[in-house]
Each structure stands twice: as C-alpha cells, then as structure tokens.
Amino acid sequence: LWRLGDRRSADERLADIEATRNIPDVQDAAILYRELFQDPRATSLSDSRPESLNGSVFNQRLYEPWRSEEAPELARFIEKHRYIIDKLLEASALDECRFPLTTDITAVLSEVDYASMRQWAFLLGFAANNDVAEGRLGDATARWRCLLQMGHHLRQRPVLLDFIVADGIQTIGLKRLIRFVVAEESTETNLKRIEAMPLPTADAWTENLRDIRMADDLPVQKMMEQWSPTERLKYRFYAYRFNKATGGLLNKSTSEDKAAQSYFRTMALARGLRIIIALKRHRTEIGHWPESMDEIAALLPEPILMDPLNEGPFVYRRTIGAFELYSTGANKIDEQGRGESEGSDDWPIWIPPAPAPPSRNGQDPIMNELKAIYGERYITRPRADANAP
C-alpha cells in the first residue's frame, strides 16, 4: 500500500484535496497572476532592466527613497511596466489564491513562474521607494502591502518552493517597512495602515508542513503506480543508496529545514515590525526610544514579543540616540546582531546603518584640515540619524 489504510490512487487523492481548495474564479488571485505569466513582456523584466542597476545601486534603489531625476532610466522603466503593478495591485485586493496542485512530476514547479514573481517584487520595491521620495505615501504603502499579499498568496499552495519564494518576496516588503517606520516620517495614519497589512506573524508551520508533505507525495505515488512491485523496490533501494553516497543531496528533511528557517526568519521580521511600531509610538509620545521593551510590552500580544527562531525574547538594546533589535537565532547566542554574512547566527531586525563616509569632493575646509593632520582613513563625519530622539 502507498499509505497504510489508504487505497486511493494519486489522482483520487488529488481530487479530494482540490475539492477542499476550490473557490469561485472571481475570488481567485491566481487567475490574475496567470494573465501576467502569459505576457512575454511581463515575464522578461530582467532582460529590460536598466544597466545602471548594478551592485550596490540595486539595493539602494530597492530599500531607500529615490527621486526620478536621480535615476531617470529606472523611472522610465517603472512607467513602461506600470500595467504590471496595476495587475498585481488588483490581485492583492483578493485574499484567496489557488495555484493548482498536480500529480505530474514534471509539472509541479511549472504552475507558478517564480522567477517572474521575484522580478515583479523588485519592480514593486523600486516603485514604492520612488513614491516615498516624491510624497506619494499612499501609493508606497499599497505597493508594500502588495509584496506581503504576494507571499500570502503563494503560501496557499502546499509546495515547499512556493513557501521559500514567498519568504523572499515578503522579506523585501518587511525590511523596507521597518526602515520606513524607524527612520522616516511615518505618521500614525501610516502606522495603522501597516498594522492592517497581512503581516505573517502567526506560526502555522506544523500544519503547513503536513500539507506540503501530503502534496509532495502525489507525483511520486503517480509515477510509482505505473511500476511493477519489483521496480518500486528498486527505486527505493537506489534512492537510498544515492542519498547516502551524496551526503543527503536528495534528503527531503534538509530542504524542509532550510524552508523552516526561511519561514521563521520572515516571521521574526514581521513580529519585529509590530514591535517597532509600538516603539515608534512610544518615541512620538514620550520623545525618546524606550530604555527597554518592558515599556511597550503591554501594548502588544504576548506571541508578538516571542522570537520564533528560538522561542525566547528578542534582543532590544538602546544605543546613543537609537536602538538595535534582533534575534539571537537558533543557537540562542547573542552575537551582537551579526548575521550570516559575518559568520554568525543572529538575525537583524533593525540595526542602525553605519555613518556615511566623509565627503571626497574637497569642498569642506574643516574636513580637509583634519585630513591633513590625521590622514583620511581616520576621519569620519557622522550622518544625521533619523533614528535619533
């Protein structure tokens, strides 16, 4: 038997699952995404993206406000593809999304164009930052909400890669929202809009993983139904030997562990955003950031204060005129907020950006004099920090 006590074929099991997922087309955001999947222009954004978006400029435009005159090529690129943004906003107005499941092992990953959805996420991020710089905060928050809703839509199909891509898309929106709340002019109206967004703060990983495994079994079962009992035994034997020889290359649990880490890191950002909104309200009312999270704990549901990566508290630390907020990661060791890029396990929620380097245009006489005395490498002019009280 494929499953003890379950004699249904893969197609019968799939039909039962899809019956529980069925919704009217007018409620299904997947219909709108599919229209974009079938548009060659919408699925080739990376080919037409401005060449100026190289290296650090890409992240700068994705996470910081910019004006059209600063990046005219990018502004024209956004305007040319505004119809994609409009279609994504239309999809984001729907809560339900039903990308189909399948028993065809060759088609599992072809129902969703992951690469295009990632490119659309970048497009939304670029456009939102242009909106912020030019005073269109309502448009910016709509685009950030759209990023979160895209992730919410993807997670409604129990496929591991859908969850991983969802995390990546939502992370763009969450990181940008955190910066907006902390370091920019976020009003109470903006904070309420953000709180109303589909923030992924609830832990449903156990239920999600159960559904993912069930859907994951279907294509394999369908394939093995066409084999003789001997061929099925051979498949299991060779799969076991290959997995052992390659150190778990095909080990499903390894992929699940990575997906779980991504899921909980995204959740940590979402919970961190809720905490930061409470911190910002305290700063607006009192005039400075709290000395500890005890001052705002009563304003938040208890689960929001829990770090999902280790089920302990987040680290909140006041600095000079600012603060740091981060997870100590699965190892529960406080490594001062340093993340994977620095060889550590911490997961930063908000670490104030480093001061800008000194001007090199030679127009600052005081800085030039200091350089002459001490040498340029020792001179740093601190940048005004909007995170300060």
What residue spans do the PLM features occupy?
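Short acidic linear motifs
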Residues: 1-389
